[in-house]
């Protein structure tokens, strides 16, 4: 009997051990699958740059004759790099060690310059056209804005740190150049932070920065020393959206003050002007404050890119350029609707005919990495946007020729976020000098194509999947209005795929994109 019990017990223990082993192995396999899936989701597509120099940035640059000139040559590659510029017009000086061009813009005309960057590995050259004339922002402006990271917590030190990181992270090396303050740099009459409370104007009517910004000119100078540009914010109303001092009835004083401080970009936000306009919703009422500031900016001896922000009222894309603005918001703050990036982009794309060099539709900032919640203006936290949608987000903004302003915490940039922000071939699509905004075709509930003509005769094509499962998406030559053999290049991975004759089909990740360039094969 005892032997029988021992045998049964031994068999039972063996069975239990086997079951435990199977459960453990299954759990480990499932965990591995989950981990691998997560790793795949956060796959970095942008190749690492080599040690040799590679010049990036726009091929054409607009500026006004006789005004101060500042341009940092965007260039990847191991430092030190020696820069040179053949046929640089008189009045401009290149620092060969930093690649920063300064001076006074030459007389009206087009100036073709050959930029060169050389280090111990190799040399790169690029044609760069300076167009001295009436137009600025001949390609969509690129930079950083503090709002969706820091809201009313912004300080002078944070702005300087952002400028430092724009250089050290490599963002400036692919073309990001503006470091922009949004709301909350001035005084308010009431605020939870006592250092932001004080008189809004001095006895002469000059606007007073709050105590977190002790030296506005010093801040702009600090940014300029790095070859970058400084942006500022105000409202045509008496108060900004956050309740700080606006520019109402002090427009000329403020415009001149911004220029004296050395700012290069102005965001002009409707905010409390709605109380001034009252019930008047006529086109003239919408235009009035923006025309006034636009005329003032054009009268200054400084190039200031003008960003008109009033959320698309009165079909602003139809008349924004009349005010002298270089870009205009086409919708409400995107921070409240980050789950609707596709909807916002598709609506913005409907206005593509109004987008051209010096005149850009602006669907708001790129919000990835660490961002604050728009509703409660909370501290930055990792974005909840799926990685595949982050690739789609950047691809959409590039295809639409939208201004590229990152608005996340610069101090928490990670490799994945920088891979999204700093792919130079994706940015080339955004900065293409033809200035076209992409055309949406073959649109259904689950997928669509966005097609953009490029200056060299090729086309950038985004194959987008809005669904929650991966799917095959096809671009046929007849839809793209191309014919014959085409070299298909994966723009994110920066590699040629194959030569095709009549269509391109690919599996697109859920909520994601495959972004390609189609170049005729001779």
Where in the sequence are the language-model features?
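Proline/serine/threonine-rich low-complexity linkers at boundaries of modular beta-sandwich domains
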Residues: 35-53
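A short beta-strand micro-motif common to beta-rich folds, especially ectodomain repeats
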Residues: 73, 109-121
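Carbohydrate-binding surface patches
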Residues: 391, 397-400, 405-407, 442-482, ...
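Glycan-recognition surfaces
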Residues: 253, 303-409
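C-terminal beta-strand-rich structural cap/linker in extracellular carbohydrate-active enzymes
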Residues: 499-522
